[in-house]
Design a protein with these regions (language model features):
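Phosphate/diphosphate ligand-binding glycine-rich loop within oxidoreductases
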Residues: 36-38, 42-147, 277
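Short, structured coil segments at secondary-structure junctions
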Residues: 71, 101, 121-122, 179, ...
């Protein structure tokens, strides 16, 4: 029996089976081939979607807008300055109104409860473009990128180095548990995922053959690693005052050539972006002036090296988001 997720919301990969996740990855690969070959795929010309952004974005916004237009849909973008949500109108009321006008709603913001309430009250598919807890669309792009490199992902080891409490690390643990992979969170003990989420993922892993490991030992994290993953050390919405403490805690987990040498020779490097790998940003230069380090979570030589796949990964955001929209709206 084929996979059918029409009409469903995409809030967290905990809600999806391994078969459904693999279906979305394979569908994204097909859309990628179609776009590369110039094959038109305006399959949803009668649909309209709205993008709600409480947090800024480059890749997520562009991926949703281009993906929607490739499918023939109309797109409306709303940010806090151009909507009343939560200010003069309740979230529930906003959701009900948007559900009358649009066929699908994307939300990128802070609380996971907001995207869940949008799905509860709107009556249309809602897609999580990022919350403080989860980043599920990023995971599909990550897994497509890894699958392009390795084929079957079962048994492959992915290690996240850094602040393993964040939305990306949470979501990586979920998707790896679903796909029968070996997930390792490698970072300071005080920056590990919540026990509740770990328990949920371990329960999934017991069914899929996946493995969940938490460690503060870089050598353990890097050993036999196929996919080296990191993210910035302070997430969106967190105060800049956290930099000093985070740098002290996380500098030992910086992805550099020495760490990459401990992984498998064929290992790839992934990063959800943006990255502070040099001094070419205002933040990067400020960090250099304050702390004397030219790079943070990943060094420039790794970021620009032959094992780096983060720009393939970024492109794959578009193809995977397109797959999610199509599969839930077709």
């Amino acid at each position: 029996m084929g996979v059918n997720i029409r009409g469903r919301s995409f809030l967290t990969l905990l809600d999806f089976t391994p078969a459904e996740i693999n279906y979305l990855i394979d569908l994204a690969a097909e859309f990628k081939r179609m776009k590369a070959n110039g094959v038109e795929h305006k399959f949803l010309t009668d649909k309209q979607v709205v993008l709600l952004f409480e947090k800024t974005s480059t890749r997520t916004r562009c991926a949703f807008e281009v993906g929607a237009r490739d499918l023939g849909m109309g797109v409306t973008f709303l940010d806090p300055a151009s909507s009343q949500m939560g200010k003069k109108e309740s979230l529930a009321d906003t959701a009900k109104v948007l559900g009358r006008m649009y066929d699908g709603i994307e939300y990128r913001g802070f609380k996971q409860s907001v995207v869940e309430d949008l799905a509860k009250y709107s009556g249309v598919p809602v897609w999580n473009g990022l919350t403080d807890d989860f980043h599920p669309t990023q995971m599909l792009a990550d897994m497509l990128t890894a699958k392009e490199e390795f084929g079957d992902l079962r048994g492959r080891k992915l290690t996240f180095f850094g602040d393993a409490r964040n939305n990306v690390a949470n979501s990586l643990m979920v998707v790896c548990s679903k796909l029968g992979m070996r997930f390792c969170a490698c970072g300071p003990k005080e920056l590990m995922p919540s026990e509740t989420l770990v328990a949920k993922c371990q329960a999934v892993a017991a069914e899929t053959g996946a493995e969940i490991v938490l460690t503060d030992d870089v050598a353990v994290g890097a050993k036999d690693c196929d996919i080296v993953y990191t993210d910035i050390w302070v997430s969106m919405g967190e105060p800049a005052e956290l930099w000093a403490k985070r740098i002290e805690l996380l500098l030992p987990y910086q992805v550099n050539k020495e760490l990459m040498a401990m992984a498998k020779p064929e290992a790839i490097f992934l990063h959800c972006l943006p990255s502070f790998h040099d001094r070419e940003t205002t933040v990067g230069e400020d960090i250099y002036r304050q702390f004397g380090i030219p790079a943070m979570e990943v060094t420039d030589d790794v970021f620009l090296g032959k094992q780096a796949r983060q720009f393939d990964e970024a492109e794959n955001r578009m193809h995977t988001i397109k797959a999610v929209m199509y599969a839930t709206l077709k």
